[in-house]
Amino acid sequence: MATSQRKILVTSALPYANGPIHLGHMLEYIQTDIWSRYQKLRGHECHYICADDAHGTPIMLKAQQLGMAPEEMIAQVNKEHQQDFADFNIAFDNYHSTHSEENRVLASDIYLKLRANGYIKSKSISQLFDPEKSMFLPDRFVKGTCPKCKSPDQYGDNCDACGATYSPTELINPKSAVSGATPVMKDTEHFFFDLPAFEDMLKEWTRSGALQTEMANKLDEWFEQGLQQWDITRDAPYFGFEIPDAPGKYFYVWLDAPIGYMGSFKNLCDKRPELSFDEFWAKDSKAEVYHFIGKDIVYFHSLFWPAMLHGSGYRQPNSVYAHGYVTVNGAKMSKSKGTFIKARTYLDHLDPEYLRYYYAAKLSSRIDDLDLNLEDFAQRVNSDLVGKLVNLASRTAGFITKRFDGKLAKIADTTLTDAFLAKQEQIAEFYETREYGKAMREIMALADIANGFVADAAPWQLVKQDDQQEAAHQVCSNALNLFRILVTYLKPVLPRLALDVEAFFQQTLTWDSLGQDMAGHEIAPFKAMMQRVELDKVNAMVADSKENLQATSEPEAPKGPLASDPISDTINYEDFAKIDLRIARIVKAEHVAEADKLLKLQLDIGGETRQVFAGIKSAYSPEDLEGKLTVMVANLAPRKMRFGMSEGMVLAAGPGGSDLWILEPHEGAQPGMRVK
């Protein structure tokens, strides 16, 4: 048991109840599940809560298309979601729905408290109305050109291209996404949440350590733009909760969706009387609350949600952790290429433990996107899990069973065991801080050591010699004990494998038993625990995910960066070959006091340090850059500037200002390597 037991409530974002779970979704649930399982492994009281996000016009219209009542459709989707999660070994303590009595009561309670405290404003607004369907158009059912960056085909609440938020009436050339008709303006009374009233509180909270630095920096941009009152109303027809004292008016889905965390926990408390709802959600709560989310919903979880909680007398979350998107083979998930892979399609072909490990091996505490490279996926799983981890037991367990009555020897030389146990606090810290990739690398480095030990000792040779039986017993027992420690470290990531290993050792793997003396312990006969990833199964999964898209008669007009910034004139290879691109590590980054756009970087290029001034100040804080790998032009003539000598150039992509991203090589690249 942990020396000081924590009380923790952890959530993943609620999946929308109008479609299946895909591998992009699964990143978040795997990330959260690993963290929750780790906390439980350490002996903490941890409750992992989730629910389906089951309200809104999209669900109402989808149900109409299917000829079903919305309640019937969301119940069916909820069942499918829960089955997918269960088969991926996602261990929710409770999975509910926002379309529940608990959520209705809590949403009304929070709204009425906000209204009583003066944070709800009422005013008449002009809203877009579909004249063909005779309905007001919610923001996600209007499309047009973004009023900020002018990107086309954007929804009516926020722009996917630049991240700006706005009202549907601000769109340029709006169209109804329901009928395609041009909307007309019509007056209606709406209720607004007074978000600007919480600006000081939010500025303090967002810089309190509750958010990742990247998130806090992004929120600063929104503070600079000025917070706006938030429309929490939708007009009938709408599938959701009716607002108290306002017939025909409904809560916008983003009001009751995060309250769904509370609703699901209340549902769990009703099932388990020993749990106290107020112990976790009251304003003076000493329990911990953590939300894991995707970077696309930062605005709602980091501004609206804590403000709503504060204004209605509830506690705020300790932290909100955001992650990036999933790409497949270096590109956005694609139905035509078969890389838009549903969770169920994956499960039809491959072991969920494979994906859990691969995602863990690539996850960090940052908000970087994660690429699921299917070839690398197969190679890494086969190398790490089959070739290193399970192989350690398969090479030694048989000797224990056949020659030593299935019992482990008392290990005379504990040098390796001590070295493995010495890593537990470092691995624990990596799990706690969501640096799963670092934890996996640490664990696999230990697996390499263990396999090297077995290879050098060669127990298959020792057992053939009468005078080396005790040595063989020692080697195999030592190897299996190291295997037990490794699988205990990996238990949050590979829960099914951990169960198999527990059956093999005939004991539960716990963090507190890592250093247990296994002398005389009897093991069960070894059974195969994990199969290699076969590429034909990966290819079959991709084939099953493909959708044939009808070819268009005319080529699509260019979109995105190429439309405004076309490719330059062709150059000869000789011209390109003159440019010497090198991997560089940013050793130090600091502000340049006299410059609005520049940061001063000290770059290690493998045996040499360069000073470079880079115009990326609007996009990065110095602390975000230190330790990163990037790419620099190493043979650019030094340039004397007012602030000092610039000895090269770092490469970045984007239109400029805050929309710049430095190039970051994949892991394995080292300072000084040439980029070819």
Curated annotation (Swiss-Prot):
> Which residue ranges does the UniProt annotation give for the motif 'HIGH' region?
15-25
Cellular location(s):
Cytoplasm
Cite a single Pfam family from the UniProt record: tRNA_bind
The residue range of the signal peptide is none
Q: Which residues are noted in the entry as ATP-binding?
A: 335
Residues reported to bind Zn(2+): 146, 149, 159, 162
Cofactor dependence is on: Zn(2+)
Q: Which GO terms describe its molecular function?
A: ATP binding; metal ion binding; methionine-tRNA ligase activity; tRNA binding
Q: Which GO terms describe its cellular component?
A: cytosol
> Can you tell which superkingdom this protein's organism belongs to?
Bacteria
This enzyme catalyses: tRNA(Met) + L-methionine + ATP = L-methionyl-tRNA(Met) + AMP + diphosphate
User: Which HAMAP family did the record assign?
Assistant: Met_tRNA_synth_type1
Describe the subunit structure.
Homodimer.
> What family does this chain come from, according to its entry?
Belongs to the class-I aminoacyl-tRNA synthetase family. MetG type 1 subfamily.
Q: What is this protein called?
A: Methionine--tRNA ligase
Q: What gene makes this protein?
A: metG
